[in-house]
Design a protein with these regions (language model features):
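Glycine-rich, highly charged phosphate/nucleotide-binding loops
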Residues: 69-87, 308-321
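Redox- and metal-dependent alpha/beta enzyme cores, enriched for Fe-S-associated oxidoreductases
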Residues: 27, 38-39, 44-56, 247-312, ...
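Acidic/His-rich segments in extracytoplasmic proteins that coordinate ligands and/or metal ions
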Residues: 80-155
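Metallocofactor- and cofactor-centric catalytic cores in central/energy metabolism, strongly enriched
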Residues: 12-22, 26, 34-43, 62-66, ...
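TerminUS-proximal long segments
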Residues: 316-324, 329-331, 335-341, 346-401
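A charged, amphipathic alpha-helical module
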Residues: 1-31, 145, 153-281, 309
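Short, acidic/turn-prone active-site loops that include or flank metal/cofactor-
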Residues: 56-62, 132-133, 270-275, 368
Length: 401
C-alpha cells in the first residue's frame, strides 16, 4: 500500500515538542499553552491566538534527574516529562495547564513550577492546577466551570489579553470539531476488512493534531483525508487479527507499530492521546453558555479510571465492547504505564470482566514509558495473536461438526 504523502513530515513533527509548526506559530505571535491530560479542556486552550501543545517526551533515554526529584516507583510518563522540562525542552511555552488528576503528573508539574522551568524572562507565564471531580453530575460540572474560569480563562485574559468570550469559545469549538470530523472520517475507514490506513499511520495523524497548532495542521489533515479517500488498497489483507488498544498514555506511535508488526492490526484507539474520546466532536446548543457545555462534555466523556463510581466503570466497559463490535476487532489489548495507580486496577478488573461479561478476549500488559523494540512485549503480543487464531480455528471446526 502506498505511503501517505505527508507521513514523513508528520513523523518529523513528532520528533520534538517544539516542532516546526509550533515555532512558526510563535514567530507569528501565537501563544503555546502546554497540557498533558484530557481533563484540561483542550478546546479552551485554543482561544484567540493561543494554541495547545499536548506534551510528550520523544526519545527519552535516562530519567535520573526526574527520579531524584520524584521517586523510582512513580509513573514513568510523568518522570519523562519532568526530565525533558529540566533539560529546557518546554521553555517555549507561555503557560502550563495542569490537572490534579493523578499524583505523579501533579508532582511533575509542581516541580516544573518550583524550579521555574519556563525560564526567567517570562513574567506573564502561569501554571494552573485544576481540581477535577470524581464524578459527572451537575454539581461537578459547576465545580470544574469555576476552576477553569478562575485558573485558565482569567490569567489568559489578564496576562495576555486573550478573548475568552462565549463567541471566542464557540469559534474554538468549531475549529476543534473540524479536526475531529477529519480524523473520525479517516478512523471510520478502519472498519473495512482491508483499511486504507494502518493503526500506526492513524496514530501519527492523531498525535500531530494534539501537538501542533490547529490552524497550521488543518490544511495538511484536509489534504491527507482527500488522499486517503482515493487510495488504492492492497487486494490481500496483510494482518492476522484485528485488535482494539485500550489504556493510558500512548504518545509514541512506534508502540502501535510494534503491535502491528506482530500481525495485529490496531483498528480502535481508546487511550490517552488516542481518538477516543479526545477526537470526538463537541455539540453546542444556543440555549446554554458555551463554557458550561464544554466543561460538561469533558467531564461526561472522559474514559479515565479515576472516575470510579459504578456507572462510570460500566460506561467504560460498555464503550470498549461497543468499539470491539463496531470495528470488528477480535480482541482488546489493555495496556498501562508502569506504576500508574488508576490503570493498575482498571486493567486487572477489565482482564476479568471483559471476557466473562462481554466475551472479549483480552491481553493485559503493563509497560515502561520507553518501549523501543521490547522483546518481552513483542513476545506477549505474538502469543495473543496466536491464541486468537487458535480460538477462531476451534470455532470453525466446531461449526463443521
Amino acid at each position: 500500500m502506498k505511503e501517505l504523502k505527508h507521513l514523513i513530515y508528520f513523523e518529523n513533527l513528532l520528533e520534538d515538542a517544539n516542532n516546526e509548526l509550533v515555532r512558526k506559530a510563535e514567530a507569528e505571535g501565537d501563544l503555546a499553552i502546554g497540557y498533558t491530560c484530557f481533563h484540561a479542556p483542550e478546546v479552551l486552550l485554543n482561544l484567540g491566538n493561543c494554541f495547545s501543545v499536548r506534551l510528550r517526551a520523544p526519545h527519552t533515554n535516562s530519567m535520573e534527574l526526574a527520579t531524584y526529584y520524584m521517586a523510582n516507583n512513580s509513573c514513568e510518563f510523568s518522570r519523562a516529562l519532568l526530565e525533558r522540562a529540566l533539560e529546557g525542552n518546554y521553555s517555549f511555552l507561555h503557560a502550563m495547564a495542569g490537572v490534579d488528576v493523578c499524583e505523579a503528573n501533579n508532582r511533575a508539574i509542581e516541580n516544573m513550577e518550583i524550579m521555574h522551568m519556563q525560564g526567567e524572562d517570562k513574567e506573564k507565564f502561569f501554571y494552573c492546577n485544576l481540581d477535577i471531580p470524581y464524578s459527572d453530575d451537575e454539581d461537578c460540572v459547576e465545580h470544574i466551570r469555576e476552576q477553569v474560569s478562575r485558573k485558565i480563562l482569567k490569567p489568559l485574559r489578564e496576562n495576555y489579553g486573550v478573548d475568552t468570550s462565549d463567541a471566542a469559545i464557540r469559534a474554538a469549538v468549531r475549529e476543534h470539531n473540524e479536526v475531529c470530523r477529519i480524523l473520525t472520517e479517516i478512523g471510520e475507514l478502519r472498519k473495512l476488512d482491508i483499511p486504507p490506513i494502518t493503526g500506526y499511520e492513524f496514530a501519527v495523524l492523531v498525535l500531530v493534531s494534539y501537538t501542533c497548532p490547529k490552524r497550521l495542521i488543518l490544511p495538511l489533515l484536509r489534504e491527507t483525508l482527500e488522499e486517503i479517500r482515493t487510495l488504492q488498497v492492497d487486494p490481500e489483507k496483510n494482518y492476522r487479527v484485528r485488535v482494539a488498544v485500550v489504556g493510558s498514555e500512548i504518545d509514541d506511535p512506534n508502540l502501535i507499530g510494534l503491535i502491528e508488526s506482530c500481525g495485529a492490526l490496531v483498528v480502535a484507539d481508546r487511550f490517552c492521546y488516542g481518538s477516543f474520546p479526545g477526537r470526538q466532536e463537541i455539540a453546542l446548543s444556543e440555549q446554554e453558555d458555551a463554557l458550561t457545555q464544554v466543561c460538561r462534555w469533558y467531564l461526561q466523556n472522559t474514559e479515565c479510571p479515576r472516575q470510579s463510581s459504578l456507572h462510570r466503570v460500566k460506561y467504560r466497559n460498555d464503550h470498549v465492547a461497543q468499539l470491539v463490535r463496531d470495528f470488528r476487532a477480535d480482541g482488546a489489548i489493555y495496556e498501562q504505564m508502569k506504576f500508574c495507580t488508576y490503570w493498575s486496577y482498571e486493567r486487572v478488573i477489565a482482564n476479568q470482566i471483559m471476557p466473562r461479561d462481554y466475551g472479549i478476549q483480552v491481553l493485559s500488559i503493563d509497560r515502561p514509558y520507553i518501549v523501543g523494540q521490547s522483546g518481552q512485549l513483542r513476545t506477549r503480543v505474538q502469543a495473543f495473536v496466536e491464541s486468537i487464531e487458535m480460538k477462531k480455528l476451534r470455532a470453525a471446526r466446531k461449526e463443521e461438526k
